[in-house]
């Protein structure tokens, strides 16, 4: 507990929160261009081939982003929209690609949780 004299000498320091997605520069999403699309393996208890892409953002950052959903058509030079959100079992992957925007198509044949994967409502027969 500081004395009043100590508080007069120097005020209390504000606690600043460190952002978990610095490359977005305080924006909800950012546009970027894929420089490399590849698969990588997750951390220890899990086993899979996770689809990720290296992306150069409009902010100038080069980040690794996860491609959610089953199947994708992304390749080098594809323009994508990137949002924050890490993938727990992939170290260094702190961003997600938004499906159904720009060059990223929605997940084919998806009927549940469609809004998360950029799929339009199916036509009623």
From Swiss-Prot:
Alphabetized SUPFAM superfamilies for the sequence: Nucleic acid-binding proteins
GO molecular function, one term: structural constituent of ribosome
Main localisation: plastid
Subcellular location(s) per record: Plastid, Chloroplast
Family the entry assigns: Belongs to the universal ribosomal protein uS12 family.
NCBIfam families: rpsL_bact
Role according to the record: With S4 and S5 plays an important role in translational accuracy. Located at the interface of the 30S and 50S subunits.
Protein known as: Small ribosomal subunit protein uS12c
